[in-house]
Each structure stands twice: as C-alpha cells, then as structure tokens.
C-alpha cells in the first residue's frame, strides 16, 4: 500500500500574483510560480499552498471563514505582530502551551488563516 501525503491546500483569492507577494512577505513562503490562474507557494517540507484566482474556475469565493490549513511558524508572537503592523486582522494567541498555541488572521482577500507554534 503506497503512503499518503498532503501536497497542497487551496485558497481562493482575487489576484493570485498580488496574493503570492503578500504571502511571501508576511509568512516567508517561496513563490514557485504565479499567474492570473493561480500561484503556488512552498516552505519547508513537501506541502504547498495554491492560491486560486477567478480564471482558474474555482467555485469558492475569497473570504473563507475557516482555515484550509495551518501555517506552522517559528515565532508566533513575532508573526502576529508583523501581520498586525501590516494591517491584517489578527486574533489573540490562544490554546494550551503544552499542546499548541495558535491565532487566526485574515489575508487581504478576507480568508481566515490559522497560524500555530507546532
């Protein structure tokens, strides 16, 4: 039986190229490709994020009220501060220190993001 891996999470956006720049600046993701159709970003590991624009035919509209994945960051407080300083709506850090700390934020398209410390 072959192993299973999660390869990408899809997030609907209005402009994949602009959104890719924001995700790169705010979360340190590497832009692999970006077009009017979509943008693929990656970080450490094998998973990626695919930002899907209207030209892709995706049926979901930007502004998801729930996170399609979580983003593991090295410094939760620093990431939260950077997002807030750059105008993103951010929630309070919550969770249990011995299990997982997290906060939510919104990207410029209003999609909910979940950022975690593990």
Describe every region a protein language model picked out.
Residues 1-20, 47, 67-71:
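N-terminal beta-strand motif that seeds the catalytic metal site of vicinal oxygen chelate
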Residues 19-24, 83, 110:
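Conserved active-site tyrosine of GNAT-family acetyltransferases
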Residues 20, 39-40, 88, 92:
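A generic "structured core" feature
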Residues 28-34, 89-93:
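Short secondary-structure junctions
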Residues 30-64, 112-118:
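Conserved short beta-strand elements that form part of the metal-binding/catalytic scaffold
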Residues 39, 67, 99-103:
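Short beta-strand micro-motifs in enzyme catalytic cores
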Residues 69-83:
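Mid-chain, well-packed structural core segment of small domains
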């Amino acid at each position: 039986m072959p192993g299973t891996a999660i390869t990408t999470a899809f997030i609907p956006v209005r402009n994949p190229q602009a959104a890719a720049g924001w995700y790169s600046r705010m979360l340190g993701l590497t832009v692999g490709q970006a077009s009017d159709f979509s943008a693929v970003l990656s970080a450490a590991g094998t998973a990626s994020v695919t930002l899907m624009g209207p030209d892709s035919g995706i049926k979901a509209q930007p502004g998801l009220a729930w996170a399609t994945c979580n983003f593991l960051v090295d410094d939760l407080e620093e990431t939260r501060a950077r997002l807030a300083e750059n105008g993103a709506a951010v929630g309070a850090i919550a969770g249990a220190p011995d299990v997982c700390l997290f906060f939510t934020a919104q990207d410029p398209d209003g999609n909910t993001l979940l950022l975690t410390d593990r």
